[in-house]
Structures are given as C-alpha cells and as structure tokens.
Amino acid sequence: MGEFFADLATALPRLLGDGLQATLISFAGGAVVMVIVAVALGVAGHQGPKWLQVISRVTVEFFRGTSLVVQLFFIFYFIPTFTGVDLGSTWTAILALGLNYGAYGAEVVRGSLNAVPAGQWESTTALSMPWMTKMRRVIWPQAWALMLPGFNNLMVMLIKGTAVVGLVLLSDLTFEAEQVRRQVGTWPAFIAALIIYYVIALIVSTIMRVMESRAQRRLGLGDYEIRKARKDAANALSGGTAGGAAGGVLTPDAASLIPDPGRGERDA
C-alpha cells in the first residue's frame, strides 16, 4: 500500500502539469465553440427560413452521425493538406470538440425553444415586438433556463471527450497518464487521472447548476415549476411538440416574462 501511494505521488505532478493544462484549454475552448455553434444551429433550425433549417439539420446530423475521432483526424490532416493552413494540435482539438458537441447542443437549444409555451410567442406577436426584442426580452430568458440542464450534461460529456485529443499529438491528461503508466504501473496513473477528471466535472457541474438556479429564480419559478419545465424540455427533445409544452408553466403575460434582476433576491 505504501508503494502504491508513493507511485501515486509520483504520477500527480506530471498529470497536474502539462496534462491538466492541455485538458483545461481544450475543454474551455471547446465549450466556447460548442455554445456558439449550438445557439447558431439551434436558432436557425427553429426560427430560420426553410432553406436555413435544412442546412442546420444536415450540419447537425453530420457532426452527430460521425465519430469525434474521425473529425479530429479530418481537421488535423485534411485541412492542412488541401488549404495549407496548419491549425496545430490545440486548435484542432478545440474545433473538433466544439463542432461535435455543438451539434448535440443545437438540439438542446431547438428543444428548449419548442418548450416555450405557444402563448408567449403569440403575445410577442400581438405586441408587434421586433424579432430581436422578442427573443431577448421574452423568449430567450425562458428558453435559457430550460437549456442549462442539457448544457450541464454536455459540458460533462465535453470534459470526457477531451480524453481522445491525444490522438492528434496533444499531451492531455489521458496522454500523460499513459506515459506515467509505463513508469509506475497502471493503477496509480489512471486512478490519479480518474480523480482529476471527476473533480473537474464536479466543479463544472456545480457552476452550471448555480447558473440554472439563478436563471429559474429570475423567472420566478418554484420547485414544482422547475421540475415541470425540465420535463417539458425533455419531452420536446425526445420528439414532443410545442403544444404539449404549453401547459402554463410560465405566466402568459408577456410583460411579466421580462427578467426582473431583483426578483430572485426578493423571493429569497
């Protein structure tokens, strides 16, 4: 047992150095790209003209239907060969992770927009709100609160997805664990990596849950409404319709849907 902990102590510094840094950079960059891609494709698939919806759907299905490993190799080898632009290992990892998980995130965005009650859309139309004002002041605050649980799951999946970026010569946590394994054995190296991955996922998940709670409190949602809103979003993602989600989870008065920054504090 003493030898095990000695080997574990040997493994940790290397894993917490270059390995952890590469993993965190890949995750942070991939998360930014993922959110941008998810919002762009999700809104286009829900609100765009027919031709834009088709492009959004084809793009989503392409990145969801092909392997992340294949996408990594495609970006790493194909783009430099045919364009002369060498992205390097780090940018290849960020781009591949962002596009792959962004395609899944697009369905989270589209499903959350579907889950906003139909009465809210009708209210904004009756008030002749411009599209940008409608989305920013009424629709998006509701949809954002419904998106966060799905984005929470995707963030955790993204963290685990960084384990394959070593295939494009990036010295991430898993790559460094494999190097340490050759020196001190399998158990210490990968137990250390497991603990580090878990801690990262726990921190990210906690932050996302805090964001989710704040977004829902700003809309004045109680525990029952929060659970029902989550269920409606899940139904929309699994093929439900907006009509099925329009059960009055949120107040139908469009004016009352404008987020009140002080509401959360007053409710508390």
Residue ranges of predicted features:
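Transmembrane alpha-helices and adjacent helix-loop boundaries
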Residues: 1-268
